[in-house]
Amino acid sequence: VFCLDFSGSMSGDGFDELDDAMNYILDYDRASKDKLQFSAKDKITVITFGSHVYNTWHASGHDTDELRKNIDGSVPTGTTALYDAVIKGLDILNKDSDDYTKTIIAMTDGNINVGTFSDLKNKYKKVKDEIPIYSITFGSAEEEQLEVIADLSNARVFDGKTDLLTAFKKVRGYN
């Protein structure tokens, strides 16, 4: 599950970086050059958020054109409800089959100003699997809140601004 920050604080470079990153990882040919492509069996969910969860889109590993079009056609606006988006991701993964490795990747600047960490923590305690919640930062990232989320789920925070390829490789390598 990708939780994509489409809030107003991502306007400009942050959103451009996020958009480029998603186009890269969802493009089979480009991603396969770095051995990061999704397999045909992979299930991909993209949750977009700003002031609240805006959209939830689903695709299989090789059928990502519609996801890319939806992301490309989006405009950042609103505040930052990352906790709500991650909770939505946990709900989706908690209902999903045990046949898959489950991961949440938040792609954000980390300026969370809607919702509470305690809501996320309470939800996390109720999920049946230990699901890592990684963050890849963009724009003028605020990493403190993201580090707390990573600590909760035994994950990490990566800098998407300086070395996106390494961030993707590490996240994919942990799974």
Residue ranges of model-derived segments:
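Von Willebrand factor
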Residues: V1-H58, A85-V86, T103-M107, T137-A141
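Alpha-helical membrane and juxtamembrane elements of multi-pass inner-membrane transport
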Residues: L4, D65, T80-Y83
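Sec/Tat-exported extracytoplasmic proteins
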Residues: L4-M10, M22-K33, G50-V53, I71, ...
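VWA/integrin I-like adhesion module and closely mimicked acidic/polar interface patches used
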Residues: E17, G73-I87, D91, T108-D159, ...
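Short beta-strand-loop
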Residues: Q37-G73, D91-D96, N113-L120, E143-L152
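A general structural motif
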Residues: K41, D99-T101, E130
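Conserved aromatic
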Residues: G61, F158-K161
